[in-house]
């Protein structure tokens, strides 16, 4: 977005909040497709002539306004030429440009708030693994957790109402309604999972923006309750919330909810309440009793239905005891268990033993869902037996090995925080044997005969465990260093879940 300022003249729109004219600016659509990073490309690209593109944009918007949504059937919507149902290039350009333009007011507010507060960004907080050190520190001291499936809005108008408090351009909001209705089935008043799936695939950037705006409103209540109940205002909380909320609206939350919640219920003023979220799933953990957790459950359901006008029911929130149930979160099974330890104390001439059993958060690789993902990708069958994977005949043996090695490394990298490595070793075994069977099938041989025929160094890198690299690089590495590597490691460069790991 920093590169866009020279083209979009954001200082002018900062004062007037007029976004509608940007729809008719040629460079908005060029920037949406990556042509704006070099200003000379705008002049050299024949397909982006100002006059012709402006006429295309006007024609598409006029066509959209003239549609009669009351007579369009479900079959007709599949053949709708707008928004790329027939993969029309100009419709795609218009929708992508719209997605960039609608982000401008939020980007300006984020920049101004960061400059005023002098907040230093910590990009390591973007890593998925940065959540687990927080869980390891807090969850062993908590008793119950509420697994929450975040509800989706029942009508498209809710998304427009969410944005109208921040986007002041009425013409632009009016056009936004037509965009949203065009993406959905016009004969349906309720948003379905199928329409959401089509929406997210046809324009992922626009979908993510609307989803983050909606989640931002949903999570605002948690920040408001924290500010009302907390006596110590930690400066780090603003930085952490910047990653979750994206737009830094702490002052705005206090104004919005102060009138709606003049008196905060006592059970909401819980200093031991902790909240984490990833995508559409969140966890609310507390040291409260089951009675208070059920009050939280009832409160959240009523809040969603009455204040945010979204459909929800009690079954979307499951309350579990942390010591007896595992959390299925971020493709890990996490549970709190006691870790017994014996400590020997020496006082003068007397010595005695102390039995200590502190709670510890266990993070385990979900072996059954992961084998299901491998079976779906044709690496093994349903019970985990490795099979040969169909591959292109023109690929060399080294290319096939490198592809399997890349998958194995990615999985090992993501599950490096597992407290038990046994399940990960089984997954590696499936991938390695599947690679051998794939190569044997290519050479029209059996796996055993193929291994006898090739050189032992052929699979050396593929069969070398990650822990063995420490010994190869540092031959005299200490025992403590090797033990540290065999433990849990959380990486700060993982920003998304591997496709095979994402079984949720």
UniProtKB/Swiss-Prot annotation:
Coiled coil, from the record: none
GO molecular function: RNA binding
Keywords, in A-Z order: Chloroplast, mRNA processing, Plastid, RNA-binding, tRNA processing
Main location: plastid
InterPro entries registered for this protein in UniProt: Domain_X, Maturase_MatK, Maturase_MatK_N
Subcellular location: Plastid, Chloroplast
TM region positions: none
Record bears the keyword RNA-binding: yes
Keyword set includes RNA-binding: yes
Cystine connections: none
GO biological processes: mRNA processing; RNA splicing; tRNA processing
A cellular-component GO term for this protein: chloroplast
Highest taxon of the lineage: Eukaryota
Family: Belongs to the intron maturase 2 family. MatK subfamily.
HAMAP family assigned to the protein according to its UniProt record, in alphabetical order: MatK
Function: Usually encoded in the trnK tRNA gene intron. Probably assists in splicing its own and other chloroplast group II introns.
Name of the protein this chain belongs to: Maturase K
